Structure formats: C-alpha cells, structure tokens
C-alpha cells in the first residue's frame, strides 16, 4: 500500500521540487530544497538536518552556550507533517512544500523543536481539561522592494501613478482593489495549503492590511497554519514586486503590526 508521499507524487507527476521546512526559535523558516524523490525518502525517516539550526540567532549564527555545535553538530531525523504537504502556487515552477519535525533515532522529539515545545504545553492544558481556541489576526505592511536612501522602508507606489500611499484609509476597499492580484494569490495559496483564511481588511495605516484565520481548537495545527499563512503572504508579495513585512514597527510615524 502506498504512503502519503507516494500518493502525492502519483497525483503530481510533473512536480519539480519539494521544500522541507521547519521553524526555528525566531520564526525563521529553515530547511532544504530537494528533488521530488526525496519526499519518499523523508516519509520513511531518511531525511536529516542539524539540530543546532533550531537555535540559530536572527543573523544565522550559533549562539554561545547551547553546546550543540561543539558536541559535533549532530543531525536528527525529519518527520514530515503530513497535512502540510501541498503545492505552492506562488512558484514559477510546479513545486511543493511541507513542514517537518525532528526526532532522535528512538523516535523521541528533539527538545529544541518549537512544535514539540507547543505540544508539551498543550498536554498541560489537557491535564486541566482545557482546550485553547485560536484565531490569529495577522497584520502586515506591503512595502516597496526598494528602500529609501537612508535605508528605511517606503510605501509602494499607487498603481498608475508616481505617488506613494500616504493616507490611513481604514477599511478602504479601493486600496484593497489596488492589490487585487496579490490578495487573489494569497487566497489561492490559503485554499491549496488548507489554511482557514476568513477575511482580509485594510488596516490603520497606509499600505497596512490584516488577514484573519477562522478559529478552531487545534492549537498545534493553528500554529502551523499561521506560519504557512505568513510565508504565503511574503512569497505572494514578491510576485508583484513588493515586500510584506510583519515587523512590529516598520514606520515610526504609523501604526505598528500585531498578531492577536
């Protein structure tokens, strides 16, 4: 009987690449790009990556004190999160992506895996007969890919003009329409990735928007979906020569971004 990886490859014979992704302590996606055949290898526990990469700092350096690098920088087995395997619609070729979690040779989760840490917290909720219900609201700015001369970000140009967005315009549908192609791609991405994206609105600053996910009571799944939604937004923006930033305060004079 074929497993999920073999079935996925049968359904997508023209697949060109698979991205194996895990999230480090800072929310940065790390992993490998590999040939489609590697998916079968990964589904059987044959894909490995270094444990130390979970605790890299935001500059990608190994922080002192973890002991992971000096002890040999060992690898761990990467297990595919099956329900995360999907085609990526923002790719120029037919590519797929999936999340992975790391475990040791005995099947025990790696202590530094954020998914494992969250699972441990959720077990404590279960002991209290509680179940958290999560519905993230994700705020972000769409900005020009070109920075100002001083290195600061700048608003994108209003389509068909040489002017940049300046007005707050909360809930303005005209500004949403200006980025219709971007939001269509984000919606398509959410649908293909199984992300319960519910609404998108214009937020309280020029070029600022919010996408809400529909609430449910599987907190680990919601954490996966929120990460994948953020990645989808960033990659979709690049297709329209924009950058999406979730930075807390990219503009000192405008409202900050939050996730609540």
PLM feature segments, named:
Residues 1-199, 221-225:
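ATP/Mg2+-dependent ligation/transfer catalytic cores
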Residues 60, 142-143, 207-208, 254-255:
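Short secondary-structure boundary/hinge segments and terminal tails
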Residues 21-23, 143, 200, 212-214, ...:
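Generic beta-strand/beta-sheet core signal
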Residues 41, 46, 204, 251-253:
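A broad, structure-centric signal for solvent-exposed, well-ordered loop/edge residues
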């Amino acid at each position: 009987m074929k497993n999920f990886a073999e079935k996925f490859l049968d359904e997508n014979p023209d697949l060109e690449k698979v991205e194996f992704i895990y999230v480090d302590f800072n929310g940065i996606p790390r992993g490998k790009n590999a040939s489609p055949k590697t998916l079968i290898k990964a589904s059987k526990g044959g894909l490995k990556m270094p444990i130390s990469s979970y605790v890299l700092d935001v500059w990608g350096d190994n922080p002192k004190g973890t002991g992971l690098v000096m002890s040999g920088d060992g690898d761990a087995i990467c297990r595919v999160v099956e329900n995360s395997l999907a085609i990526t619609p923002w790719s120029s070729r037919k590519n797929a992506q999936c999340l992975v979690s790391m475990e040791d040779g005995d099947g025990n989760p790696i202590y530094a895996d954020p998914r494992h840490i969250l699972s441990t917290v959720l077990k404590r909720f279960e002991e209290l007969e509680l179940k958290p219900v999560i519905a993230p609201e994700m705020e972000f700015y769409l900005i020009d890919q070109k920075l100002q001369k001083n290195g600061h970000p700048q608003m994108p140009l209003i389509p068909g003009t040489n002017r940049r967005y300046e007005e707050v315009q909360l809930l303005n549908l005209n500004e949403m329409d200006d980025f219709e192609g971007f939001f269509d791609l984000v919606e398509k991405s959410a649908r293909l990735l199984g992300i319960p994206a519910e609404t998108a609105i214009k937020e309280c600053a020029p070029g600022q928007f919010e996408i809400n996910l529909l609430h449910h009571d599987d907190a680990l799944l919601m954490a996966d979906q929120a990460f994948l939604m953020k990645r989808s937004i960033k990659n979709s923006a690049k297709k329209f020569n924009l950058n999406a930033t979730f930075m807390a305060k990219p503009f000192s004079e405008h409202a900050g971004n939050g996730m609540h």
